[in-house]
């Protein structure tokens, strides 16, 4: 079972990835992790990737796909895997298909942008302890003050509203063509097309988990 998990920043992909991975006994595959591992090990692909990164350029799709193919030969992928943050682009999706890497399911966790912005921009954190609050859902007793120490809370740069909006713009620009590509394969009756599930991402974490697992177990 090979699964691609899609969803904008802030929809809870990390949490749901863990549930899927544990339920089906398949590893999460992250291109970032693969790159770091290959560079650290000094493999031919790692050396090539490091050269590109050191020059300030983006690692090519060719190198990324080669890393994915290499990762899939590992024994822990014998029953499948969960792709985390990959493919990101239409070019990568087409390259997967061209190289015969079959995908069984695509799960999109769907949350409206307005909800995501509220979730992320409302976060506040106590940096020293890591304690996290939310101005609406889990507010501190005193505005912007840590309950235990009385020290000020901080809003991370990534959680600022303008930053969240920009990240969402990038996500939609990259992912909407990807979604259209896979849906077209399915609608055209392609026998190799993955099954596509769009999962409502609002509600309790456990409810979202149950929706995803129910879809994948049908």
UniProtKB/Swiss-Prot annotation:
Subcellular compartments: Cytoplasm
Kinase in keyword set: yes
Protein residues bound to ATP: 10-15, 123, 132-133, 203
GO biological process entries: AMP salvage
UniProt entry keywords in alphabetical sequence: ATP-binding, Cytoplasm, Kinase, Nucleotide biosynthesis, Nucleotide-binding, Transferase
Molecular-function GO terms, alphabetical: adenylate kinase activity; ATP binding
UniProt catalytic activity: AMP + ATP = 2 ADP
Region (NMP): 30-59
Annotated region described as Disordered, given as residue ranges: 141-161
Record-linked Pfam families: ADK, ADK_lid
Listed EC numbers: 2.7.4.3
GO cellular component, one term: cytoplasm
Region (LID): 122-159
Pathway(s) served: Purine metabolism; AMP biosynthesis via salvage pathway; AMP from ADP: step 1/1
Entry-linked InterPro entries: Adenyl_kin_sub, Adenylat/UMP-CMP_kin, Adenylat_kinase_CS, Adenylate_kinase_lid-dom, P-loop_NTPase
Binding locations of AMP: 31, 36, 57-59, 85-88, 92, 156, 167
Job description of the protein: Catalyzes the reversible transfer of the terminal phosphate group between ATP and AMP. Plays an important role in cellular energy homeostasis and in adenine nucleotide metabolism.
Domain notes: Consists of three domains, a large central CORE domain and two small peripheral domains, NMPbind and LID, which undergo movements during catalysis. The LID domain closes over the site of phosphoryl transfer upon ATP binding. Assembling and dissambling the active center during each catalytic cycle provides an effective means to prevent ATP hydrolysis.
UniProt-listed HAMAP family: Adenylate_kinase_Adk
Family per similarity comment: Belongs to the adenylate kinase family.
Subunit field text: Monomer.
Record protein name field: Adenylate kinase
Native source organism of the sequence: Pelodictyon phaeoclathratiforme (strain DSM 5477 / BU-1)
């Amino acid at each position: 079972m090979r699964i691609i998990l899609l969803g904008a920043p802030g929809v809870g992909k990390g949490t749901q990835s863990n549930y899927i991975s544990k339920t089906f006994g398949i590893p999460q595959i992250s291109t970032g992790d693969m790159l770091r591992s290959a560079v650290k090990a000094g493999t031919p692909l790692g050396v090539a990737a490091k050269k590109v990164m050191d020059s300030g350029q983006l690692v090519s799709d060719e190198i990324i796909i080669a890393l994915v193919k290499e990762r899939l030969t590992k024994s822990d992928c014998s029953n499948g895997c969960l792709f985390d943050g990959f493919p990101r682009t239409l070019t990568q999706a087409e390259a997967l298909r061209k190289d015969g890497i079959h995908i069984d399911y695509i799960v999109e966790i769907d949350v409206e942008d307005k909800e995501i912005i509220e979730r992320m921009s409302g976060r506040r954190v106590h940096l020293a302890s890591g304690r996290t609050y939310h101005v609406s859902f889990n507010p501190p007793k005193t505005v912007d003050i840590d309950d235990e120490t009385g020290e000020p809370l901080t809003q991370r740069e990534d959680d600022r509203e303008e930053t969240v909006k920009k990240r969402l713009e990038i996500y939609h620009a990259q992912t909407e063509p990807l979604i259209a590509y896979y849906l077209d394969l399915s609608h055209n009756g392609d026998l190799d097309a993955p099954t596509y599930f769009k999962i409502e991402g609002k509600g309790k974490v456990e409810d979202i988990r149950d929706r995803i697992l129910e879809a994948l177990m049908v």
